[in-house]
Structure formats: C-alpha cells, structure tokens
Amino acid sequence: MEKLTTLTGVGVPLRRSNVDTDQIIPAVFLKRVTKSGFDDALFYAWRRDPNFVLNKPEYAGKGQILVAGPEFGIGSSREHAVWALHDYGFRVVIAPSFADIFYGNTAKNGVLAAIMPQESVELLWKLLEEEPGREMTVSLETRTVTCGDVTLPFEVNDYVRWRLMNGYDDIDLTLQHEDDIAAYEKMRAEKFPFKPKTIPAKHWAEERIESAREPEDADWTGPLADRGII
C-alpha cells in the first residue's frame, strides 16, 4: 500500500451530511471482486445531475481531498465505498464524524479519514467555494490541513496514522510475522503429521429416497388422485 505522509491536491467541497455507503456506491456495482474500476460508480446517482460538484470542470477527475458533512459513510459496511473513493483519486476525506466501520475500512485501503470540528469544515467549504479548484495540503506528520493562509488541526487515531504513514495494509502487517508463522506451520506439521480425512460422498451406499408424493398404497384413489396430483 502506498505511504501517505503529506498530500497536496484539489479540495472538493461536498455540502452533504449523513452520506451513506449506498450513495457513495450503489449496490448494483458490488458484484466486482477487484478493488479497481469503481471510479465511474462513485456517487453514481448524484453524478447524473450536471450541477453536482464532481461534474464541474474545476473538480472533474481532479479531486484528491474530499470535505464532507458529519456522519460520512453510514449504512451498510461495504468496503467498496472506500475502493470507489480511492479509485477516483481521493486519498483524504475530511468530515466532523464518520461511521465506525467505514472509518476502519479507510485505513486498510490507504485513505485518511480526518476528523475536524463542524466549524472548521464550514470554513474549508467557504474557502474552496470561493476559489474552485483550489489546492489544500494535508499533513499526517503535523496532523494539520492547510488551505491558503489557514491551517487547521484534525484528529486521527494513532494506530491509523502509523499504518498510513508506513503504507501497511493487512497483508503487510501479517508478513511482519512471516518467520513466526513459518515456524508454527513447521512445528504443527511435525507434531501432527496426520491430516483429517472425510469419506467422499461417492463411497456411501446408494439409498432410495421415498417421494413424499408417492402413496403407500399404489392402488389407492381419492380426491388428489382423481385430480391427477398423485
């Protein structure tokens, strides 16, 4: 995973609160099993509106820092929401608050979820809207956001900050213990050389299954038989 320490890029003001994961990426796009190719699906319904912020020439395909309202990422726990943001180009999302599961998914996929007071977010919205296409700088080292002459602090979990600055995803963290894992697997193979076995289904004797529709007396007739049901 690519390291993230300092990022300078175009800030996008998204004046919306309670943005849920279905608005970030509709469920119809969740059938894909790769983490790429979701950029066109990001905010799919909203982007049908020609006046949506990402359709404006100052932001289209250029945004790297998204500034949104509170409770960003609520709803179902689809990791695709973060994949779509990252695939579009966003490495940072700034908001007063985030849904817990969404917040956890951001760190695993190289996206910073920076928590900032509502008044600070509103100030950033004002600055970005005054000069569309304006660049901002986000520093994980100092935990600050700079936009023009304004520098504001943000909150980030220490563990999340450490992961992002080192570029560690879950696989990277696991590989740090590769020697211990290999030693355990070697010990396990030596101590428990056998492997559990199951009898394949084809070795079982065939057994006829009685149909629930077959009457015990083949000569029996009745209302159902008269109607041709049995």
UniProtKB/Swiss-Prot annotation:
It catalyses: (2R,3S)-3-isopropylmalate = (2S)-2-isopropylmalate. Keywords: Amino-acid biosynthesis, Branched-chain amino acid biosynthesis, Leucine biosynthesis, Lyase. Pfam families: Aconitase_C. The keyword Chaperone does not apply. One of its GO terms (molecular function) is 3-isopropylmalate dehydratase activity. Pathway: Amino-acid biosynthesis; L-leucine biosynthesis; L-leucine from 3-methyl-2-oxobutanoate: step 2/4. Heterodimer of LeuC and LeuD. This is 3-isopropylmalate dehydratase small subunit. The gene is leuD.
